[in-house]
Structures are given as structure tokens and as C-alpha cells.
Amino acid sequence: MSIGIWQIAIVVILVVLLFGRGKISSLMGDVAKGIKSFKKGMATDITDEPEPKNVSENNQDSKDKE
């Protein structure tokens, strides 16, 4: 026994009647803004990482200080 197209249609109609089209569209807009800000945050995190120094450079710096 699987879910048919009529059962899905009835559920969609009930959701639209309960929440209204305006509420659903504003909710989807908020979800889209959240996804965009998440992607933007992930992109800036990747580009903000400093380049690692070579180990030999770190050893030379410590030897010069001694």
C-alpha cells in the first residue's frame, strides 16, 4: 500500500487551507535567505584561512631568536 497522487493532493490542499498561501510563501522565503547566508558564511570561512608556513621557516625563525 503506497501513497498515491490523490493522498498527496489532499495533504497539500489541507496545508494550504490551514496555513494560507502568504504564510507558506514567507516561510519559503525565510528558508531561502537562510540557505544563502549559510553558503555565504561557508565561502568566507574558506577564503579567510591563512596560508600555513613551512616548517623550515618556523625553525629558522626560532634559531634566529636564540
From Swiss-Prot:
Its main location: membrane. One of its GO terms (biological process) is protein transport by the Tat complex. It is a single-pass membrane protein. Keywords: Cell inner membrane, Cell membrane, Membrane, Protein transport, Translocation, Transmembrane, Transmembrane helix, Transport. The chain crosses the membrane at residues 1-21. Residues 43-66 are annotated as: Disordered. It is found in: Cell inner membrane. Residues 50-66 have a biased composition (Basic and acidic residues). The Tat system comprises two distinct complexes: a TatABC complex, containing multiple copies of TatA, TatB and TatC subunits, and a separate TatA complex, containing only TatA subunits. Substrates initially bind to the TatABC complex, which probably triggers association of the separate TatA complex to form the active translocon. NCBIfam families: tatAE. Part of the twin-arginine translocation (Tat) system that transports large folded proteins containing a characteristic twin-arginine motif in their signal peptide across membranes. TatA could form the protein-conducting channel of the Tat system. PANTHER family: SEC-INDEPENDENT PROTEIN TRANSLOCASE PROTEIN TATA (PTHR42982:SF1). Belongs to the TatA/E family. This is Sec-independent protein translocase protein TatA.
